Amino acid sequence: MICSGEFGGLHFFNAGNLVSRGEFIHQRRVMKCWVLIYMLSGSLDISSGGICRSVASGEWLFLKPGEEHFGTAPSEGELSYLWAHFSPETPFFEGESGAAYTLPEYGRASSQRIGVIFRQLVDCSRRNMYTTRMVECALEMLLTELTQEHLDSCGRCPLHRRTLLCSRCVWYGSLSVNLPLAAGYQPI
């Protein structure tokens, strides 16, 4: 699991959309930054950190800085994926809980939101009218959405989110003595 102790603090470098009509094989390289790939169509066969994967439509993959990655087989048919290069101010770490960003290295999007936000990031990065901060905010939103999808899929809900949900129940519904317990409050 890729983790960060704090939100924000991301340096965005560039992003784009690779499209190939067939026989694409990812070149062998080592990047000094993080790479995030999100597949729109087709399948990308790639090795990174000694692990071979076939990344299909609707799936994402993080490639770590300093690790060699390369294609392991040519693509069949059309291939299209979005990619972004970035670095955090505070290095990501391997961990599991208590982190602002909690990102599996590889996963499947459970909604269309990931693709929509990623396209916004690519679009913002291509327009000169946007500030650097706006592009970094789009990247933050993408990583936050990936984190939220992961937490939702694991059935884990951070304490502040549980508290917010309980507050909504109080605001829109009836008050119950069980609400503080649902938010994780433990009486003395």
Place the predicted regions along the sequence by residue.
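Basic/polar phosphate-binding segments, predominantly the helix-turn-helix DNA-binding elements
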Residues: Y172-I188
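Amphipathic alpha-helical segments enriched in hydrophobic/aromatic residues interleaved with Lys/Arg
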Residues: G95-H160, C166-G173
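Generic structural signal for secondary-structure transition and capping sites
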Residues: S20, L44, R126, L151, ...
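N-terminal regulatory/effector-sensing and dimerization cores
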Residues: H11-A100
